Amino acid sequence: MSTLFQALQAEKNADDVSVHVKTISTEDLPKDGVLIKVAYSGINYKDGLAGKAGGNIVREYPLILGIDAAGTVVSSNDPRFAEGDEVIATSYELGVSRDGGLSEYASVPGDWLVPLPQNLSLKEAMVYGTAGFTAALSVHRLEQNGLSPEKGSVLVTGATGGVGGIAVSMLNKRGYDVVASTGNREAADYLKQLGASEVISREDVYDGTLKALSKQQWQGAVDPVGGKQLASLLSKIQYGGSVAVSGLTGGGEVPATVYPFILRGVSLLGIDSVYCPMDVRAAVWERMSSDLKPDQLLTIVDREVSLEETPGALKDILQNRIQGRVIVKL
C-alpha cells in the first residue's frame, strides 16, 4: 500500500536549480531498497552544493536531497533487516544519484545501511551524520597510524565546521591535547566548550608563505580544509606524525614538497567517508557510540529545523553561517 509523504526535492529548470518541499508517494521511491520511516536527517556542505546550480553533485533531476538519514525499517526484502529495526544511512549515492534522506520516507539498499548501535539514539546519529562519521574515521585512521595522547598535541583545522567541531570533541574524549584552528575569532569559547585546549587562527597555520619544512608543532592533524593550508601544516607535523585529510573547502590543489614525507616520515592519510568499506564503517560507528562519543555531543548542534526550514539552512551552510551541525526532524 502506498503512502503519501513530504520530501525536499531539487528540480532543474534550464540552468537553474530550485528546491521545494513536495508531496510524494512511496510508490515513486526505488523498489530495490529497504523502506525506512526517517526520524532525523542532517545537513552537510555537500547537501548545500546539491541544492544549487553548478554544484556538480546531483547526477540527474528531479531528486530528493539528503546524504544522511536515520530511522526505522517499515518493510524489507533484505534478510539482514526487519520491520522495526533502527538504522543509519550515510553517503554512498544517497542524495546524489538516488533519492535521499531529507524526506519522511527513504528507500535505501541494504548494503548501505548500518544498524543503529545500542548506545546511540537516532537523533544522535544525525548529530553525527556524514560529518561525524568523517571525523571519527579521521581519528580512527590517525590512531591506526600511531597517534596517541602522550606524543603531543593534535591540530584540527576548520574547527567550527561539522567535521572539525566533532573531531575536536572526539579527540578531547580520547584524552588528546587539541589545538583548534578557525577563521572565526569569536568562536574561541565555543571551541573550548567542545574540548579544545588552545584556539588559534587559520593564519597561525598558514600565513601566506610556504616553506618546505617549518618548526615541528603537532603530532597529527584532522584537516577538512585542504589547499595551501594543508601544504603549510604538513611542514609543521612532528617526525613520524600523520595528517588525515577529508575535504577541500580551502582548495583542491596542495602545493606541498616531498620534504615532510622523506625527511620526517610524515604520512598523509586520505579519508573517504562515501565508499568506506562496510566492515570499517560499522566498526567506526560502534566507536562513535562508545570511546569516541563526546560527553557534550549535542553542544555541536547549531540548530534543529523542520523540512520546511531546510532550504534556508542549505543556503546558510554554503555562506558559512552555521557553527557546527544542523539536524532536520522529520
Swiss-Prot record:
<feature type="binding site">
    <location>
        <begin position="182"/>
        <end position="184"/>
    </location>
    <ligand>
        <name>NADP(+)</name>
    </ligand>
</feature>
<dbReference type="Pfam" id="PF08240">
    <property type="entry name" value="ADH_N"/>
</dbReference>
<feature type="binding site">
    <location>
        <begin position="160"/>
        <end position="163"/>
    </location>
    <ligand>
        <name>NADP(+)</name>
    </ligand>
</feature>
<dbReference type="InterPro" id="IPR036291">
    <property type="entry name" value="NAD(P)-bd_dom_sf"/>
</dbReference>
<keyword id="KW-0963">Cytoplasm</keyword>
<feature type="binding site">
    <location>
        <position position="320"/>
    </location>
    <ligand>
        <name>NADP(+)</name>
    </ligand>
</feature>
<protein>
    <recommendedName>
        <fullName>Putative quinone oxidoreductase YhfP</fullName>
        <ecNumber>1.6.5.-</ecNumber>
    </recommendedName>
</protein>
<dbReference type="GO" id="GO:0043957">
    <property type="term" value="F:acryloyl-CoA reductase (NADPH) activity"/>
</dbReference>
<feature type="binding site">
    <location>
        <position position="262"/>
    </location>
    <ligand>
        <name>NADP(+)</name>
    </ligand>
</feature>
<comment type="subunit">
    <text>Homodimer, or homotetramer.</text>
</comment>
<dbReference type="InterPro" id="IPR011032">
    <property type="entry name" value="GroES-like_sf"/>
</dbReference>
<dbReference type="InterPro" id="IPR013149">
    <property type="entry name" value="ADH-like_C"/>
</dbReference>
<comment type="similarity">
    <text>Belongs to the zinc-containing alcohol dehydrogenase family. Quinone oxidoreductase subfamily.</text>
</comment>
<dbReference type="GO" id="GO:0005737">
    <property type="term" value="C:cytoplasm"/>
</dbReference>
<feature type="binding site">
    <location>
        <position position="248"/>
    </location>
    <ligand>
        <name>NADP(+)</name>
    </ligand>
</feature>
<feature type="binding site">
    <location>
        <position position="202"/>
    </location>
    <ligand>
        <name>NADP(+)</name>
    </ligand>
</feature>
<keyword id="KW-0560">Oxidoreductase</keyword>
<keyword id="KW-0521">NADP</keyword>
<dbReference type="Pfam" id="PF00107">
    <property type="entry name" value="ADH_zinc_N"/>
</dbReference>
<feature type="binding site">
    <location>
        <position position="273"/>
    </location>
    <ligand>
        <name>NADP(+)</name>
    </ligand>
</feature>
<dbReference type="InterPro" id="IPR051397">
    <property type="entry name" value="Zn-ADH-like_protein"/>
</dbReference>
<dbReference type="InterPro" id="IPR013154">
    <property type="entry name" value="ADH-like_N"/>
</dbReference>
<feature type="binding site">
    <location>
        <position position="45"/>
    </location>
    <ligand>
        <name>NADP(+)</name>
    </ligand>
</feature>
<dbReference type="InterPro" id="IPR020843">
    <property type="entry name" value="PKS_ER"/>
</dbReference>
<dbReference type="InterPro" id="IPR014188">
    <property type="entry name" value="Acrylyl-CoA_reductase_AcuI"/>
</dbReference>
